[in-house]
Amino acid sequence: MSKLLERLLGRLPVGWLQLTHSRTRFAAAVAGVAFANLLVFMQLGIMGAMSTTTLAPYNFLDADIMISAEDANTLTDGSNVARARLFQAMTVAGVESGAPLFVGILEFKLPDWTNSTLQTFATEVADRDFLSAEIAAQFSRLTQENTALIDTKTRGVDASVFADLKDGKPFAFEVNGQTLTAIGTLELGGGFSADGTLFVSDQTFLRFFGKRSSGAPNHVLLKVADGVSPQVVAERLRSILPAASVQVNTLAEYKAADLAYQSLERPTGIIFGFGVLIGIIVGIVIVYQVLSTDVADHLKEYATFKAMGYEHRFFLGIVLEEAGILAVFGFIPGFIVSMGLYAGLSAVTSLPVYMDGTRPFMVFF
């Protein structure tokens, strides 16, 4: 290692020699930096899972613009929207078609009497073009009463439960004291607000949510004509719809706003962000403590170098050399351990906790 550093630096690797002079102290310093790296990796991993699960449901929607209640921050919260807003929107130039979107939470009761929560989406069967190709291909079958498409990756549910369903056989289960029959599947998995996802027709949705009305969906989905800018149409809609009761966004804008709300305003996102900050501070404190102690221990040697005519940048180079060595040697075990913890956490929680391509660079630099 000394020879390699000597070639890279073009001089004797004084910083490396000083750090490794006491192997016990060096190992403790590396362990501290590795822990700080691990802490940041884990917080970023969980934040990444939150971002992924927040945006994933939007992949099942195929729309350009969404009209929501003024107080809605996510797909699942906020007041309902009067269906009349859909009819108003259809009169605006550039709007080609529209559909209501109903959203709710149902509890899936398993044979062992445990429950899993299902984030439930619904629209009219005739409006399946507003859904992704995967869902739309199966959605026409939901004209049958009390039928659904169920998430086979629902958290807390053994995959064997859906074995018959994957073979083309219907799967009946209990929801809110009623029987619902799954006749198709989708794959998403659990998130922070629900254990899985369910798609039903609007009529089935209204049967299971007795207090909901067909005249008050959660959102209104719109498609614009070919060659027309969704942003331009959204501005036209904002000019005629009451801002006090509804908000109009392109689907991309609403996704970005939803993610920002989850990350910056909800307690979960704030806690994870604070954890990243703490990890960075811990790393800075550990490295500073190691470097300051090492400098203090070698003041006599530095004084000798100074008397020999070495400039200030020489000493700065030694300190930066030590900082770089600690960063590299602490990063490697932190990265390896975090990969193992990611896999374990993902297996236990069914959250999409994984290492993306940019995260190692974010943490290291």
Predicted regions and their residues:
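Peri-transmembrane interface segments
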Residues: T54, R236-V285, T293-H298, T304-F305, ...
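Alpha-helical transmembrane segments of integral membrane proteins
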Residues: A29-L39, G269-Q289, A323-G330, G334, ...
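Transmembrane alpha-helical interface segments in multi-pass membrane proteins
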Residues: S292, K300-S346, S350, F361-M362
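Residue-level signature of transmembrane alpha-helical entry/exit and packing/kink sites
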Residues: R25, M355, R359-V363
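Hydrophobic, regular-secondary-structure patches
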Residues: A34, L38-L118, Q138-Q144, E235-S239, ...
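N-terminal Sec/SRP start-transfer signal
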Residues: M1-V40, S51, A56, L320
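Basic-flanked hydrophobic alpha-helices used for secretion and membrane insertion
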Residues: F130-A133, I150-N249
